[in-house]
């Protein structure tokens, strides 16, 4: 969709999903996570790349190059604006906008006094990673140590691969594999200018064992790698310090929307499933023969009308192979659906 929208120079590209947009943290881990009402392309790219699942990182680049806005919308709340991703505003204020995390991170630590000022050492090291088909994510270095992270979402990281890699690396340095780890990333513009405001955050990390710290060259993120076992408990505390307590310069309504907890509280209670009211009837049918697939025509009609109300869809089709019952097809035809038969 992003590529088509970019090629057509569309007014916007809409991504419809099961959540209202991108949040300042994973709302299932941090109920106080705030909706991010507006992001620029680069911020959204960083959030998506460092752990957020709602948006694939590769869908942002074509929209950015074509200057096409990208909207994230909720299928269950079609009138809710969600998250709007577009060009950077000239008056954008520096500040952390999101905290994201990834589990299953593997660290490979390499040290040796011989690496200091040795020409081509890193080339020799990374050639061995390439030999085993491994893509390096984060890098931290000193005069006598280089530590890199491997992201399992981009690599096949198992004990056999790591053993072969360690054996190859042992030819040029001492090797230590540290796992399982998790990365926690603070995302926002102007991270270098915000370091003096992160004292409480640094103190929080100071209570745990931090294996690696990496700051991006584009000044958009600051990443800490810790033991996987402590990461989940740290996220709510970090969010409280940075976002919920409004410690950052950026806190305007144009950036932060309501929290996930507020949105869930305000959401209308879901109606009871139709089958609960007809339980006795269904059990009687089950006595005749099982298994049976049961459709409620009133429920089908209601859902068809909800789909019909989505303005972003030009045409709607029903796959006949799902259930070809004449009454079901008749209802869908009355609601303006076409039919797909394969």
Q: Where are these predicted regions, by residue range?
A:
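A charged N-terminal "starter" segment
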Residues: 250-342
